[in-house]
Amino acid sequence: LIVLEQAMALEADGPDLRLRLAALLHDIGKPKTRRFEKDGRVSFHHHEVVGAKMTKKRMTALKYSNELVKDVSRLVELHLRFHGYGTGEWTDSAVRRYVRDAGPLLDRLHKLTRSDCTTRNKRKANALSRAYDGLEERIARLQEQEELDAIRPDLDGNEIMEILGVGPGPVIGQAYKFLLELRLENGPTERDAAAAALKEWWAAQNADS
């Protein structure tokens, strides 16, 4: 219950049911994913994915609201994402994806990740804390540069149809997804540059068909 206790200590505005349930259930998938490796180590690969599914199933059976089930299972699924940050420098696009994937749960994900540090090794604990401080600072900088919490492609659906000369259909969704990825990779782009990239993508699609 150490993670739960540490999560509760981070609550600034009173009890947070979503955070507390996520702290309780974040490692629920470990027993099902436990493997003994040849070198003697024990692994729990993908326990966050398995745990998210188990969380959804159990909370649904307990008659929690659909919204609460969705949020808690999402936090369980994302609780390991930060650990990739400490092993190598993330690009700005990776930070954008982290924020996008967390969505309105970002603040709770911050707290859950910090509370999941249970090591007694003070040097390791301090290193993790510094790494997370660094990630939060980068997120804050990017949010100042662009409204990261409301990322949209540089062109909307009507502009896409106008530029490509096509009507509504599945291709608009595909183009929108392409432009969103472009936005995540490069940040804000001028309309002319976005239109040029869209035309280049469209030409490649037609060449492949």
Outline where the language-model segments fall.
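Charged substrate- and nucleic-acid-binding regions of tRNA-handling and nucleotidyl-transfer enzymes
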Residues: 57, 61, 119-209
